[in-house]
Structures are given as structure tokens and as C-alpha cells.
Regions:
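A beta-strand edge to alpha-helix "cap/lid" segment located at domain peripheries
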Residues: 43, 56-58, 95-97
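Ligand-binding loop in jelly-roll beta-barrel domains
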Residues: 62-91
Length: 113
């Protein structure tokens, strides 16, 4: 799914436009953050739950959880992350906000206690 990036003071906005029937396996987010469904209908599955969301809605998302997102129709999904250094370097931001696996997440949490 194509990703669009936007910035405000201290904030990183990441928009993903999903086509009907597409699925995304998300990275593990390192921080509490919010996501918004601006258009469409998605199913979000974790190891614990499966939930349906219909736009417009938003969720405050718990860190440390891997998610799979399925677009039941064309959807616009937006994550809002903190960006305290106001960097626009996407690779630096991704290292701060996500982990690729649970081992990496545990290492991040232990390093940033």
C-alpha cells in the first residue's frame, strides 16, 4: 500500500491508502499512538483479538502489539506518531517508532527505560 508522509510540530503523520482486499502486516509500534480510519472498512487482527472498524473512527493503539490489517473496501488509514526531534528522515523515525519483531521491541524497551 502506498505511504504518504506529513509533519507538524512534534508530530509525524503516516497515511496508507489500501485497496479493497489488500492486507498489511504491521510492524510492532514502540509507543502509545493514535490511528484514524478516514475512509473505508478494515479488519484489524492481533494475537488476541479481531476487530472491524468502519470510517470515520479512531483508536488509541497500545504499544508492543503486532497487527494485520485487511481492507474490506478501499480505505485510508492514518497513524499519528510523536516526533520530538522534528526530523523528516523516515528511516530515523521508523527506528524510533517501530520494531520489526518482539526481540527488537524488548531491546528497545529495555534501552529506553
Amino acid at each position: 500500500a502506498p505511504i504518504q508522509h506529513a509533519f507538524a510540530d512534534g508530530v509525524y503523520i503516516r497515511q496508507m491508502d489500501m485497496k479493497e482486499g489488500s492486507a498489511v502486516v504491521g510492524a510492532i509500534h514502540n509507543h502509545l499512538h493514535a490511528w484514524f480510519l478516514l475512509a473505508g472498512h478494515v479488519t484489524v487482527a492481533t494475537e488476541e483479538t479481531t476487530e472491524d472498524y468502519v470510517a470515520p473512527c479512531y483508536v488509541v493503539s497500545t504499544p508492543g502489539i503486532k497487527r494485520v490489517i485487511l481492507a474490506n473496501e478501499d480505505s485510508i488509514f492514518v497513524n499519528i506518531h510523536k516526533n520530538p526531534t522534528n526530523t523528516r528522515d523516515i528511516s530515523k523515525l521508523e527506528k524510533e517508532i517501530v520494531s520489526l519483531n518482539y526481540k527488537e521491541y524488548e531491546e528497545y524497551i529495555n534501552k529506553n527505560k
